[in-house]
Swiss-Prot record:
This is Caffeine synthase 1. S-adenosyl-L-homocysteine binds at residues 24, 66, 71, 103-104, 138-139. The lineage of its organism: Eukaryota, Viridiplantae, Streptophyta, Embryophyta, Tracheophyta. InterPro entries: MeTrfase_7, MeTrfase_capping, SAM-dependent_MTases_sf. It catalyses: theobromine + S-adenosyl-L-methionine = caffeine + S-adenosyl-L-homocysteine + H(+); 7-methylxanthine + S-adenosyl-L-methionine = theobromine + S-adenosyl-L-homocysteine + H(+). Pathway: Alkaloid biosynthesis.
Length: 369
C-alpha cells in the first residue's frame, strides 16, 4: 500500500516497540550520540531563557518525536540540571519544570514511561520539581495552546515527512522511481524535486505550528539527519535507503516480494542540506537562527574488528527505526529474511565500513511580535 496520505503514515511511523533484541530501546545508541553532540546547544538555550526576563514560575518544555528509548531522559536531565544551576545562581525559590513527551499514536509510550525513574525526574521536594506528561499526536500540526511553550527540543524526527512525496507516478499510474525507495542516482529529477517540495511543505507546517505555541523569545533546539552535498542522491546521505532497496530487490528476484510493491513504495523521509533548512526558516519568518552547524559521526561507533559483527550491529540499528513502516508495505513474515539480506549487503558492499552520518544542529528563537 502506498504511503500517500498523512493518516496512513501516522499509523505506521514509529520505532520498534518493547525492549527486545530488535527494539529501539535497545538500539538507540547512535541517536544518543547524535543528541549528546547537541547537549551544549540545549544547555545554552536554557541559559538564554533565564536571560530574557520571562519571570518564570514554571518552564514548559517539550521533546517532539521522543520515541521510547533512553535519549529523551537525557534531555529531561539536561534541562533540569541547567535550571537547578540557574536557580542557585539567581536564588530562585519556586521554579518548576513541566516536560511534555510527544510522538505519534503508535509510539511505545508504555516502555517510555516505564523507563522514567526518580534519577531522571527527581522528587517533588527538590529545588526544581519536574512533572512529565505524554502528548500523542503529529508535530506537523498544533499540539499546545498559544504562547505556552518556552523550550522545544526535537532530535532525529523533523526529517520524517507527513507522507511519501506526491507526484511519483505518471499519468498511467506507473511508478517513476522504480526499484528504489528513496532518491538515488537513477531517479529522474522529478523524484528529487518531489522530495524537496514535500519537506518544504512539512517543515513549514512544523514551523507554523510552533510559531503559535512558543512564547515570544522562546527557543527551539532541533537536530536533523542531513547531508553535506548539494546532491540528495549522494551516497553519504542515502546509503541506508540504497542498501535497503537493494535487499528488497533481491527478495523480489527470489519471488518473495511483489515487484509492484517495491515500485510503489517511497520512504517518507528527507535528509536536507544546511542551505535548504536555512532557506525554509528564513522564508517562514517566525524564528531567527541563533546557531546552525553540521557535523558527522561514524555510522557505527564500535571497536569491533569483525566485519560481520559490525554489519549485524548496524542492521539492528536500522531495523529498529525502519521495521514498522517496511513491514506494513512488504509483510511481517519476511522481515527476518529481509534484514538478514541487508546484513550481507552491508558486509559485502562496505565490509561494514560505512560512510559518516551527517546531522544538523539548529537553534531558533521565536521573533517577538
Amino acid at each position: 500500500m502506498e504511503l500517500a496520505t498523512t493518516g496512513k503514515v501516522n499509523e505506521v511511523l514509529f520505532m520498534n516497540r518493547g525492549e527486545g533484541e530488535s527494539s529501539y530501546a535497545q538500539n538507540s545508541s547512535f541517536t544518543q550520540q547524535v543528541a549528546s553532540m547537541a547537549t551544549p546547544a540545549l544547555e545554552n538555550a536554557v541559559e538564554t531563557l533565564f536571560s530574557k526576563d520571562f519571570h518564570l514560575q514554571a518552564l514548559n518544555a517539550v521533546d517532539l518525536g521522543c520515541a521510547a528509548g533512553p535519549n529523551t531522559f537525557a534531555v529531561i536531565s539536561t534541562i533540569k540540571r541547567m535550571m537547578e544551576k540557574k536557580c542557585r545562581e539567581l536564588n530562585c525559590q519556586t521554579l518548576e519544570l513541566q516536560v511534555y513527551l510527544n510522538d505519534l499514536f503508535g509510539n511505545d509510550f508504555n516502555t517510555l514511561f516505564k523507563g522514567l525513574s526518580s534519577e531522571v525526574i527527581g522528587n517533588k521536594c527538590e529545588e526544581v520539581p519536574c512533572y512529565v506528561m505524554g502528548v500523542p499526536g503529529s508535530f506537523h500540526g498544533r499540539l499546545f495552546p498559544r504562547n505556552s511553550l518556552h523550550l522545544v527540543h526535537s532530535s532525529y524526527s523533523v526529517h520524517w515527512l507527513t507522507q511519501a512525496p506526491k507526484g511519483l507516478t505518471n499519468r498511467e499510474g506507473l511508478a517513476l522511481n522504480k526499484g528504489k525507495i528513496y532518491i538515488s542516482k537513477t531517479s529522474p529529477p522529478i523524484v528529487r524535486e518531489a522530495y524537496l517540495t514535500q519537506f518544504h511543505e512539512d517543515f513549514t507546517m512544523f514551523l507554523n505550528a510552533r510559531s503559535q505555541e512558543v512564547v515570544p523569545n522562546g527557543c527551539m533546539v532541533l537536530i536533523l539527519r542531513s547531508r553535506q552535498s548539494s546532491d540528495p542522491s549522494d551516497m553519504q546521505s542515502c546509503f541506508t535507503w540504497e542498501l535497503l532497496a537493494k535487499a528488497i530487490a533481491e527478495l523480489v528476484s527470489q519471488g518473495l516480494i511483489d515487484e509492484d510493491k517495491l515500485d510503489a513504495f517511497n520512504i517518507p523521509c528527507y535528509f536536507p542540506s544546511l542551505e535548504e533548512v536555512k532557506d525554509i526558516v528564513e522564508r517562514d519568518g517566525s524564528f531567527t537562527i541563533d546557531h546552525m552547524e553540521g557535523f558527522g559521526l561514524d555510522s557505527l561507533q564500535m571497536e569491533e574488528n569483525d566485519k560481520w559483527v559490525r554489519g549485524e550491529k548496524f542492521t539492528k540499528v536500522v531495523r529498529a527505526f525502519t521495521e514498522p513502516i517496511i513491514s506494513n508495505q512488504f509483510g511481517h513474515e519476511i522481515m527476518d529474511k529481509l534484514y538478514d539480506k541487508f546484513t550481507h549487503i552491508v558486509v559485502s558492499d562496505f565490509e561494514a565500513k560505512l560512510p559518516k552520518t551527517t546531522s544538523i544542529i539548529l537553534v531558533l528563537s521565536k521573533i517577538d511580535g
